[in-house]
């Protein structure tokens, strides 16, 4: 710690910070543009000027840039000094000379860091009366709109896009006061994190194009704290609603998880909530008859009464909804909704993490590891936010080199200059090339079994008591030794694997490496990726596979199916699903999307999406987190009968048993769920209960300046009804209630503090800028390392050796396309590739075909005809298909192709 003196006051700060960060952490306001808590200091904008004095006797001082000046002990500065204030005002003025001053039509208005800083400096008069510099804007794809005339040349965009996120197609061109930030030519931004430009940019140069079509100012939207459902990472988001539609998603700061950034799937994949083909009323018999709520419950009870029911849950539904389904059908008749092989792998992951001697890192903690081995995962496609964390982890080498030279880590340009191209070691063992290969020390591409063999060999190289791998060639043995040496040389090694390739051996190999590292006294970590938002929660919760449920119906053991938020056709072979649905006398589906499964239902109950309901998810880290309802859809349209899955299913159970409804609010079902399973006991601590108040007030979902509430329903009736009442949570559907940053709280619907309207308002909620929330980060961990409970896994697979004329089908994952719900969003659909088949260059040469040629594949009697994509790194004997894309049956993965040839034209 250090003592600094600010305008005559002695204050304790972290001496490792710069003055800007230290003062912001104290709650003091200093305007800035180019600095960002995650990007460090470059001193480009000159906006954060303060007066620094030699000591208490110095009355003259000198102007310094606070972002470039360390907060050393006994530093004397003034923020309110007249010369400093005049300097800061002049900086804003010359930055604004070429700005169009188009706030009324700019989509950043009310959300704009430039507005905040201009007001903060007191600049309120334009003296420049000459021609302004102008630029041509670019078309940057379906996610980002571009308006270069608003640019103030802070360089944040390229520093994030290129330096932080590793993008290569956004740059800066020109010189002096005529620079251009964009692509070489029009085209879609290729980075999976391009959407963060909308928050990183302090002006309106890069804005959310998906929001443009239904635009509202930030102060006119209703928000809630929520959790991204796009993958298992558990990123925190702030969805914004107006007129019963989601309008945009912003990043919600969680110092342990996503911090300041989201991937583009999580930011732009919300469009499925607004689809017009969603079920919004109960639908009977092929969707031809709409029912009231009571009619639907009575009809469902009549259909199920006297039946042998199976309940099929879902890893994209909340724990509460899955628990309500289990209570409806009984524990012995509840099935997880996960395919058998996938369920085996997720259960194995849970066992490994429960028994592992190494802890599970948070997404933030991943950035602090200094040697990483990724085994079998294409992280950019399966856990993109973790991939972004790895990009920061490898840069730790440069920070270490800078520290040895007494250079602070926040001096971004100096650290890069010292580090040059030195990186911490990252080893990637994957099917084929990945988006992280550019920062990897070594990459190896092979079949899943061969990747697992390398993993087992690494464990044996770390500790000789680990099972050895028979028949491994010298090249693979040498690679395994190099990986082991790098992990041993590190202070904090990290092993990452997961379930995406359908291989239990990969997970077991990763577990062996973790055990071996602990035996060598290494303070490392292990992270294992599961496929969906609540896969980990379902593994803890229990329930057999969806395959077992369907077989129970086909065999006649059950004659009724209740499906919760699950499209069975995305899980198992369509023939098996067809057989089960045909055999069932009753099929009831509760879902928020129209799916092939709901099309076969006798009754569809309209379930709430994450925007219309509350619930709890468990991330791959084992962190239980609550998502909260953003809006009440019935307020604007009373005909909408959308409710959380748990509400429908509990009410159905009450109707069947002729009992009153016991769970009248979320806390009731959450507490019951927590009491049902030992490992889920902590979910009650994931968020405050409905009784939580600050100064006696509920928490406001709407900003204080929210306008038009009395007119929103005027087209329906001039009589304004009471606002919706939220009995489930501590939030109100109103601007009435507590908002702001003065009182610490974990669950923050939107970032705002007096004078701070942009995402930089998160500074006011943190214990220190870039740290954790003052009330603690949201969520509670359900898995913590309890010591070494693992035994060696000894089932080392044999080397991959396909029979001549056969190929193994393996999955290629896509950030845009492999996920079910985000793929229903129109902007995301523009980024989804056409279905294809990928083979190695050697295979294509043997077949005599070029990229784009149509290939015919025969797989177990089924024939697919798909365009060819040649993969330079895919191994011989493998055929890759894009997982989750239309026309690619999920049951094909892991099977053998027994016919591969150019299709007849």
From Swiss-Prot:
Annotated residues for binding of [4Fe-4S] cluster 1: 99, 103, 106, 112
Gene Ontology biological-process entries: ATP synthesis coupled electron transport
Membrane-crossing segments per the record: none
Positions bound to [4Fe-4S] cluster 2: 151, 154, 157, 201
Any single Gene Ontology cellular-component annotation: membrane
Cofactor note text: Binds 1 [2Fe-2S] cluster per subunit.
Segments forming domain 4Fe-4S Mo/W bis-MGD-type: 221-277
Coiled-coil regions, chain positions: none
Keywords annotated in UniProt: 2Fe-2S, 4Fe-4S, Iron, Iron-sulfur, Metal-binding, NAD, Quinone, Translocase, Ubiquinone
Known cofactor(s): [2Fe-2S] cluster; [4Fe-4S] cluster
Binding site for [2Fe-2S] cluster: 34, 45, 48, 67
EC number, as in UniProt: 7.1.1.-
Biological role stated in the UniProt entry: NDH-1 shuttles electrons from NADH, via FMN and iron-sulfur (Fe-S) centers, to quinones in the respiratory chain. The immediate electron acceptor for the enzyme in this species is believed to be ubiquinone. Couples the redox reaction to proton translocation (for every two electrons transferred, four hydrogen ions are translocated across the cytoplasmic membrane), and thus conserves the redox energy in a proton gradient.
Name of this protein: NADH-quinone oxidoreductase subunit G
């Amino acid at each position: 710690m250090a003592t600094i003196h600010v305008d005559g006051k002695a204050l304790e700060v972290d001496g490792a910070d710069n003055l800007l960060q230290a003062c912001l952490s104290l709650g003091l306001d200093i305007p800035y543009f180019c600095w960002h808590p995650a990007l460090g200091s470059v001193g480009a904008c000159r906006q954060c000027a303060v007066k620094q004095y030699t000591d208490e006797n110095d009355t003259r001082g000198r102007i310094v840039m606070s972002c470039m000046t360390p907060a050393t002990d006994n530093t004397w500065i003034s923020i309110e000094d007249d010369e400093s204030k005049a300097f800061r005002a002049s900086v804003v003025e010359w930055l604004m000379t070429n700005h169009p001053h188009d706030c009324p039509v700019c989509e950043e208005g009310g959300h704009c860091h430039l507005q905040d800083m201009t007001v903060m400096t007191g600049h309120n008069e334009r003296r420049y009366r000459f021609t302004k510099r102008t630029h041509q804007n670019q078309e940057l794809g379906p996610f980002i709109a571009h308006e270069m005339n608003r640019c103030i040349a802070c360089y944040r965009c390229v520093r994030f896009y290129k330096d932080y996120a590793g993008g290569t197609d956004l740059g800066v061109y020109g010189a002096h006061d005529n620079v251009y930030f964009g692509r070489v030519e029009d085209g879609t931004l290729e980075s999976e994190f391009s959407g963060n430009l909308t928050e990183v940019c302090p002006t309106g140069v890069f804005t959310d194009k998906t929001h443009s079509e239904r635009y509202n100012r930030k102060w006119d939207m209703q928000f809630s704290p929520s959790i991204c459902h796009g993958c298992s990472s558990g990123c925190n988001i702030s969805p914004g609603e107006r007129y019963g539609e989601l309008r945009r998603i912003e990043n919600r700061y969680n110092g342990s998880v996503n911090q300041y950034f989201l991937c583009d799937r999580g930011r732009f994949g919300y469009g499925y909530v607004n689809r017009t083909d969603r079920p919004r009323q109960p639908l009977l018999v092929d969707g031809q008859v709409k029912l009231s709520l009571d009619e639907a419950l009575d009809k469902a009870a009549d259909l199920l009464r006297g039946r042998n029911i199976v309940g099929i849950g879902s890893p994209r539904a909340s724990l509460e909804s899955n628990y309500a389904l289990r209570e409806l059908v009984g524990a012995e008749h509840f099935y997880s909704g996960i395919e058998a092989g996938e369920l085996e792998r997720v259960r194995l992951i849970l066992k490994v993490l429960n028994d592992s001697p190494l802890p599970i890192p948070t997404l933030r903690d991943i950035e602090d590891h200094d040697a990483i081995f990724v085994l079998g995962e294409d992280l950019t496609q399966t856990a993109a936010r973790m991939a972004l964390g790895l990009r920061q982890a490898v840069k730790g080498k440069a920070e270490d080199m800078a520290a040895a030279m007494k250079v602070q880590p926040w001096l971004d340009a100096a650290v890069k200059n010292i580090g040059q191209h030195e990186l911490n070691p990252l080893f990637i063992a994957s099917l084929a090339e990945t988006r992280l290969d550019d920062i990897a020390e070594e990459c190896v591409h092979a079949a899943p079994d061969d990747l697992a063999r390398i993993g087992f060999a690494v464990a044996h190289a770390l500790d000789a008591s680990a099972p050895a791998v028979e028949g491994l060639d010298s090249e693979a043995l040498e690679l395994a030794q190099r990986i082991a040496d790098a992990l041993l040389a590190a202070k904090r090694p990290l092993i990452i694997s997961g379930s995406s390739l359908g291989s239990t051996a990969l997970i077991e190999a990763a577990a062996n490496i973790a055990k071996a590292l602990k035996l060598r006294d290494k303070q490392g970590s292990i992270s294992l990726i599961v496929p969906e938002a609540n896969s980990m929660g379902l593994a803890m919760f229990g329930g057999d596979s969806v395959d077992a449920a369907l077989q129970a119906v086909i065999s006649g053991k059950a004659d009724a199916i209740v499906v919760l938020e699950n499209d069975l056709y995305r899980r198992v072979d369509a023939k098996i699903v067809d057989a089960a649905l045909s055999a069932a006398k009753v099929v009831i589906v509760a879902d928020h999307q129209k799916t092939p499964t709901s099309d076969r239902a006798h009754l569809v109950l309209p379930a709430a999406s994450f925007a219309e309901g509350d619930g709890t998810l468990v991330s791959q880290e084992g962190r239980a987190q609550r998502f909260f309802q953003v809006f009440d859809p019935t307020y604007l349209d009373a005909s909408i009968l959308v409710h959380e899955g748990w509400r429908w299913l509990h009410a159905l159970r009450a109707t069947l048993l002729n009992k009153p409804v016991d769970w009248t609010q979320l806390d009731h079902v959450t507490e019951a769920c927590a009491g049902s399973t030992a490992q889920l006991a902590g979910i009650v601590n994931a968020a405050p209960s409905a009784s939580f108040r600050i100064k006696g007030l509920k928490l406001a979902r709407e900003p204080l300046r929210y306008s038009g509430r009395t007119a929103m329903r005027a087209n329906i009736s001039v009589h304004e009804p009471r606002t919706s009442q939220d009995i489930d949570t501590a939030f109100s559907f109103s601007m009435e209630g507590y908002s702001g940053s003065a009182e610490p709280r974990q669950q923050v619907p939107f970032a705002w503090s007096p004078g701070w309207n942009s995402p930089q308002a998160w500074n006011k909620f943190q214990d220190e800028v870039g740290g954790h929330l003052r009330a603690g980060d949201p969520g509670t961990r359900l898995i913590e390392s309890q010591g070494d409970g693992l035994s060696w896994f000894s089932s080392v697979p044999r080397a991959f050796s396909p029979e001549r004329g056969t190929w193994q089908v393996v999955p290629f994952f896509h950030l845009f396309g492999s996920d079910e719900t985000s793929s229903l969003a129109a902007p995301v659909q523009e980024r989804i590739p056409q279905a294809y088949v990928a083979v190695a260059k050697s295979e294509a040469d043997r077949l005599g075909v070029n990229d784009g040629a149509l290939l015919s594949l025969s797989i177990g009697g089924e024939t697919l005809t798909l365009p060819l994509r040649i993969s330079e790194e895919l191994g011989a004997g493998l055929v890759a298909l894009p997982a989750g894309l239309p026309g690619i049956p999920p049951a094909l993965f892991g099977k053998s192709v027994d016919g591969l040839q150019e299709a007849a034209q």
